[in-house]
Amino acid sequence: MRTWFPYPLLSIALLLMWLLLSQSVTPGSIVLGLVVSTVLAWVTLNLQPARSRLHRWSRIAGFILRVVGDVIRSNIAVTLIILRAGRRPVNAGFMTVSLDLDDENALALLACVVTATPGTAWLEYDRRQKILLFHVLDIENEDLWRKTITRYAADLKEIFE
């Protein structure tokens, strides 16, 4: 049974998601969902994510609170930008920042945080030069954005490395 469903919980979760998204529980939808979820579970067999150890558990709560606070502030800022769209020009642009992170999971988490923050998007990371390229909806204060990203990176470095 393990060879048919290498990750049973993943297969079940994908099947349930399929049924929710298709808004149908017909036999055909269930069979198609089973096929898709099983194939995707087989595909994930080849993925071998890097394992990381968390070194400073005490920093995790502070990091989460900081990110939540920044996401709330960004939501408000983006809302104001949208509401004032005709009165004030939007100053969007690209920025680069040097990162001192080596752990792949820390980089992945940083990418999730940057992309989940309204008004920002992670675009590219150069591993050799350790430079992040990201987009900001309102690039009014470049130093603030650089400090925010480097602060996240420093927190993640303490947690993961």
Swiss-Prot record:
Q: Which GO terms describe its molecular function?
A: antiporter activity; monoatomic cation transmembrane transporter activity
The UniProt entry, under Pfam families, shows: MNHE
Key word Transmembrane present in the record? yes
Question: Does Lipid biosynthesis appear among the keywords?
Answer: no
Q: Which UniProt keywords apply?
A: Antiport, Cell membrane, Hydrogen ion transport, Ion transport, Membrane, Potassium, Potassium transport, Transmembrane, Transmembrane helix, Transport
Compartments where located: Cell membrane
Instruction: Please cite one Gene Ontology biological process associated with this protein.
Output: potassium ion transport
* UniProt xrefs under InterPro entries: Antiport_suE1, Cation_antiport_E
Task: Indicate the transmembrane segments per the record.
Answer: 4-21, 28-50
Q: How does it sit in the membrane?
A: Multi-pass membrane protein
> What GO cellular-component annotations does this UniProt entry give?
plasma membrane
Matches recorded under NCBIfam families: 2a6301s05 (TIGR00942), PRK08965.1-4 (NF006520)
According to its UniProt entry, what is the function of this protein?
Answer: Part of a K(+) efflux system which is required for the adaptation of R.meliloti to alkaline pH as well as for the infection process during symbiotic nodule development.
Family recorded in the similarity comment: Belongs to the CPA3 antiporters (TC 2.A.63) subunit E family.
Q: How does it assemble?
A: May form a hetero-oligomeric complex that consists of six subunits: PhaAB, PhaC, PhaD, PhaE, PhaF and PhaG.
Which named protein is this?
Probable K(+)/H(+) antiporter subunit E
